[in-house]
């Protein structure tokens, strides 16, 4: 444990040095305190769980055990459906129970049930197929050991380091995940060491990347809270050796990649803004069929306007908001991998942009929202785009999601 602490502190010093170069900061940053610990199950700005969980019981010195419920469904209509997709779907997107104990020296988190993860620019998969082909009926489950206020150690199926968007629909201000999200990991099995001290938070992780069951990924993240409303975040995570795994949940190229992010977030009572940059790199690894190097460069801004404003960051019982996401991503290089001929986007050297607009209404436990989204690709490889033959360069979607959060 001493060696791990020293490595984490060394990492923090490096990230602080980088922060002094990349950001204009003030001495006040060291005096502000983060509200709570590192986020383990984050939620967006437009939806929130009820204050009272579905079920709660006391565990004496171990704190209380909370049980929360999620039930959501959607209607999706799209133009130029990808081969194998229909023009429209009606589907349950989440039927989950979340069990957590966030007090005491030993804490647990378990998320169980069905889930769908619609992604811009990718084929739509129904909920049961997505659940069984990805992380199973227990997508996240871990134990967190908290020996003191500053340190914690998480072990199990963890939310992955990297990227700016969580995985599940109700965790986000937009219904669908974005172009940049598709290059990152969602759930990884492994261990993660967390540190929090005032305005500084950090984590280090050893994990299996894109759920490959090969523990050859390391990652680190740091957050600096500049003011009560502004936070800077940086992360790096990546594969340190070749891995031949290639499946629905473990794509060959993404599972051999390295991911870097720079994120800024402003949280106000009327506006939430989060611009971020993302860079991915896939090194040449001939032993697993990756004969060349490639990667992506992307940028995005996520903005939410709270028509009914928050009060000190807390949403009212009747909350009306509009979330918008605009992003651009380009690919470079060519991995020359027979198992992934289209590369990481729509072919080597391709690029794409997207926009999503999501008006949302939440009243107590119930919410309803609609989303209009559009993706356009450029310089795409023949057969890698939209439509039955993969020859169309754009796709529009209209999505409606309703649900209950307890």
Spans of model-derived segments:
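Intrinsically disordered, low-complexity segments enriched in Ser/Pro/Gly/Ala and basic residues
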Residues: 18-19, 24-25, 143, 293, ...
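Outer membrane beta-barrel
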Residues: 54-219, 223-229, 311-315, 323, ...
């Amino acid at each position: 444990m001493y060696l791990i602490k020293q490595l984490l502190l060394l990492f923090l010093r490096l990230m602080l040095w980088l922060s002094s170069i990349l950001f204009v900061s003030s001495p006040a940053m060291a005096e502000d305190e983060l509200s709570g610990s590192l986020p383990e199950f984050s939620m967006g700005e437009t939806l929130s769980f009820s204050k009272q969980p579905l079920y709660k019981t006391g565990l004496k010195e171990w704190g209380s055990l909370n049980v929360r419920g999620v039930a959501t469904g959607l209607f999706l209509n799209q133009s130029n459906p990808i081969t194998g997709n229909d023009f429209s779907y009606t589907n349950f997107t989440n039927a989950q129970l979340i069990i957590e104990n966030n007090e005491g020296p030993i804490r647990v988190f378990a998320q169980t049930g069905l889930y769908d993860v619609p992604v811009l620019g990718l084929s739509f998969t129904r909920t049961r197929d997505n659940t069984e082909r990805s992380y199973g009926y227990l997508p996240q489950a871990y134990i967190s050991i908290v020996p003191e206020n500053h340190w914690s150690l998480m072990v199990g199926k963890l939310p992955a380091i990297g990227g700016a968007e969580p995985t599940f629909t109700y965790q986000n201000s937009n219904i669908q995940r974005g172009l940049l999200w598709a290059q990152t990991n969602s759930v990884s099995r492994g261990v993660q060491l967390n540190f929090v001290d005032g305005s500084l938070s950090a984590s280090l992780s050893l994990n299996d990347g894109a759920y490959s069951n090969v523990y050859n990924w390391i990652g680190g993240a740091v957050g600096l809270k500049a003011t009560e409303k502004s936070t800077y975040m940086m992360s790096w995570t990546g594969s340190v050796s070749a891995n031949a795994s290639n499946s629905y949940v473990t794509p060959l190229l993404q599972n051999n990649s390295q991911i870097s992010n720079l994120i800024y977030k402003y949280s106000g009572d009327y506006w939430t803004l989060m611009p971020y940059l993302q860079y991915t790199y896939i090194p040449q690894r001939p032993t697993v069929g990756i004969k060349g190097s490639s990667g992506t460069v992307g940028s995005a801004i996520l903005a939410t306007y709270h028509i009914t404003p928050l009060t000190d960051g807390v949403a009212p019982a009747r909350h009306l908001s509009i979330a918008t996401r605009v992003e651009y991503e380009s690919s470079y290089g060519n991995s020359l991998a027979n198992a992934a001929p289209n590369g990481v986007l729509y072919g080597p050297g391709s690029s794409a942009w997207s926009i999503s607009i999501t008006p949302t209404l939440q009243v107590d436990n119930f919410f309803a929202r609609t989303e209009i989204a559009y993706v356009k690709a450029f310089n795409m490889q023949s057969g890698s785009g939209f439509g039955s033959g993969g020859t169309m360069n754009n796709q529009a979607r209209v999505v409606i999601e309703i649900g209950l959060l307890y």
